[in-house]
Amino acid sequence: MRQILVAVTVALVVSILLTPALIRLFTRHGFGQEIREDGPPSHHNKRGTPSMGGVAIVAGIWAGYLGTHLAGLAFDGEGVSASGVLVLGLATALGGVGFLDDLIKIRRSRNLGLNKTAKTVGQITAAVLFGVLVLQFRNGAGLTPASADLSYVREIATVTLAPALFVLFCMVIVSAWSNAVNFTDGLDGLAAGSMAMVTAAYVLITFWQYRNACVTAPGLGCYNVRDPLDLTLIAAATVGACIGFLWWNAAPAKVFMGDTGSLALGGVIAGLSVTSRTEILAVVLGSLFVAEITSVVLQILAFRTTGRRVFRMAPFHHHFELAGWAETTVIIRFWLLTAIACGLGVVLFYGEWLATIGA
């Protein structure tokens, strides 16, 4: 528990202190956000708001994770794990793709950065490397950071993917989650606040896996997760980093996370879901992100097949704005829905454990 508190605190402090420094730096160099011309009229006054604040989020997560391990050395704590480094490596790689995208937008003074092909190639490259490496690094108990079995709350032994299919599966998961968080990041604080809740749920889930790991507590309901405590630290650090950033990103936002932050945070969800064996459960926890990307897909499909739109504008948080909802109303209501989804996900997780032990 002490390690979790250290991870949250260090990440929060780094994020909340680094963000205003970045705001001053980006403002001085004119690194401001460009706004879609076809977006809601109320968003036009946001043009020029400093972007790429996701740098503070990524830095906060790394600081929280590494700082906890450095502090742990004084108490005979374990070093970093393969699972932890791979999840953060994935998030950082995706954040790098987002950083290039943000930088190009700023340099060209338009809301279009990397072209779709270049952005997709970057995401797929990160996903392939993650998918290949996450099945390596077998520990003394014979566990790798991920399992080739499809998983809900734990592995579904009847659905085992061949290595090539598993890598393809990782490509889908990583691309889907990174784009989903990216689409959600359209209102002040929406993505950061929602992400804090999802990763808070993962703190509970992975810590429970740690307390009931088959390596240390074999028996009914135990979990074959390689490094559950390290995943808890990553989730906790993400909570702290998002809250620290939210202090400056809440409406009216003084800074945006940009693709730097949204793609990296999507990588955190993807990485945690794969390494904690909860790929399907993650869909429940992050159902807001799922709904946002689904609204974009539906909008595109409907327009291409019928010439009509399902929503006034996609992602669908803009639909409610154009319907007359105030931006803060949309944000708070979506946060409430995220909290409900996370609560439901934790209940499903715990309920599965109770059913497994026959309680």
Curated annotation (Swiss-Prot):
<keyword id="KW-1003">Cell membrane</keyword>
<keyword id="KW-0573">Peptidoglycan synthesis</keyword>
<dbReference type="Pfam" id="PF00953">
    <property type="entry name" value="Glycos_transf_4"/>
</dbReference>
<keyword id="KW-0479">Metal-binding</keyword>
<feature type="transmembrane region" description="Helical">
    <location>
        <begin position="55"/>
        <end position="75"/>
    </location>
</feature>
<feature type="transmembrane region" description="Helical">
    <location>
        <begin position="117"/>
        <end position="137"/>
    </location>
</feature>
<keyword id="KW-0808">Transferase</keyword>
<dbReference type="GO" id="GO:0005886">
    <property type="term" value="C:plasma membrane"/>
</dbReference>
<dbReference type="Pfam" id="PF10555">
    <property type="entry name" value="MraY_sig1"/>
</dbReference>
<dbReference type="GO" id="GO:0008963">
    <property type="term" value="F:phospho-N-acetylmuramoyl-pentapeptide-transferase activity"/>
</dbReference>
<dbReference type="InterPro" id="IPR003524">
    <property type="entry name" value="PNAcMuramoyl-5peptid_Trfase"/>
</dbReference>
<dbReference type="InterPro" id="IPR000715">
    <property type="entry name" value="Glycosyl_transferase_4"/>
</dbReference>
<keyword id="KW-0460">Magnesium</keyword>
<dbReference type="GO" id="GO:0051992">
    <property type="term" value="F:UDP-N-acetylmuramoyl-L-alanyl-D-glutamyl-meso-2,6-diaminopimelyl-D-alanyl-D-alanine:undecaprenyl-phosphate transferase activity"/>
</dbReference>
<keyword id="KW-1133">Transmembrane helix</keyword>
<comment type="similarity">
    <text>Belongs to the glycosyltransferase 4 family. MraY subfamily.</text>
</comment>
<dbReference type="GO" id="GO:0046872">
    <property type="term" value="F:metal ion binding"/>
</dbReference>
<dbReference type="GO" id="GO:0071555">
    <property type="term" value="P:cell wall organization"/>
</dbReference>
<dbReference type="GO" id="GO:0009252">
    <property type="term" value="P:peptidoglycan biosynthetic process"/>
</dbReference>
<keyword id="KW-0961">Cell wall biogenesis/degradation</keyword>
<comment type="pathway">
    <text>Cell wall biogenesis; peptidoglycan biosynthesis.</text>
</comment>
<dbReference type="InterPro" id="IPR018480">
    <property type="entry name" value="PNAcMuramoyl-5peptid_Trfase_CS"/>
</dbReference>
<feature type="transmembrane region" description="Helical">
    <location>
        <begin position="334"/>
        <end position="354"/>
    </location>
</feature>
<feature type="transmembrane region" description="Helical">
    <location>
        <begin position="280"/>
        <end position="300"/>
    </location>
</feature>
<keyword id="KW-0133">Cell shape</keyword>
<keyword id="KW-0812">Transmembrane</keyword>
<feature type="transmembrane region" description="Helical">
    <location>
        <begin position="187"/>
        <end position="207"/>
    </location>
</feature>
<keyword id="KW-0472">Membrane</keyword>
<protein>
    <recommendedName>
        <fullName>Phospho-N-acetylmuramoyl-pentapeptide-transferase</fullName>
        <ecNumber>2.7.8.13</ecNumber>
    </recommendedName>
</protein>
<feature type="transmembrane region" description="Helical">
    <location>
        <begin position="3"/>
        <end position="23"/>
    </location>
</feature>
<dbReference type="GO" id="GO:0051301">
    <property type="term" value="P:cell division"/>
</dbReference>
<feature type="transmembrane region" description="Helical">
    <location>
        <begin position="231"/>
        <end position="251"/>
    </location>
</feature>
<feature type="transmembrane region" description="Helical">
    <location>
        <begin position="255"/>
        <end position="275"/>
    </location>
</feature>
<feature type="transmembrane region" description="Helical">
    <location>
        <begin position="156"/>
        <end position="176"/>
    </location>
</feature>
<dbReference type="GO" id="GO:0008360">
    <property type="term" value="P:regulation of cell shape"/>
</dbReference>
<keyword id="KW-0131">Cell cycle</keyword>
<comment type="function">
    <text>Catalyzes the initial step of the lipid cycle reactions in the biosynthesis of the cell wall peptidoglycan: transfers peptidoglycan precursor phospho-MurNAc-pentapeptide from UDP-MurNAc-pentapeptide onto the lipid carrier undecaprenyl phosphate, yielding undecaprenyl-pyrophosphoryl-MurNAc-pentapeptide, known as lipid I.</text>
</comment>
<feature type="transmembrane region" description="Helical">
    <location>
        <begin position="80"/>
        <end position="100"/>
    </location>
</feature>
<keyword id="KW-0132">Cell division</keyword>
